[in-house]
């Protein structure tokens, strides 16, 4: 996450087809960082093995902390106070350096911040690009069209900061209309909380917002587990309200 290829490196001498394999490195899941006991296996669920509901010893304080800390490897090894700063430092680096270095295009750090904040306010929700643009315009007095917003989003996706969740469309004969708008997500929930300047106590004081960030963390972990099985994660929602 955040370790993108520099512009000049895009001009590869050899494509590497047949020689190299690309591996997507993600932030650590709760199982990888040792906070999840891993008693329920996704692989077992897919083959229909029976399972029992499991519990762990994590409290609401623990979960809000883990949401704000994120799955950054170094953050899992240091004190809680210092660990929470990692996401803030990461966001600062993205908006002030990486957003321009990723493809050599000059972009405004302030607009990058506005976009991250707007994404964080709409995290785990199916909102169109127009909604994000309006949210940014409320804090940007200059002209801001959808093409500009799209450009910033593409740059942040290339930096592995933003990773929306695609809608699953089974194309079945159903009277229910399938919602096809992507769900807005970060690669790690701590990017969203840091973008809004939130900490664990802020999430506890606003449990509704915490629910959206918690969903973002669940999506992060499920992506890790699904990809280990050569799978891909999608969301589903239809006009009847059925959602998964």
In which residue ranges do the predicted regions lie?
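Conserved RecA-like P-loop NTPase ATPase core
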Residues: 1, 33, 67-70, 156, ...
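Interdomain motor-coupling "hinge/lid" segment immediately C-terminal to the ATP-binding subdomain
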Residues: 3, 9-125
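Hydrophobic alpha-helical segments and their boundary regions
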Residues: 7, 59-60, 177, 204
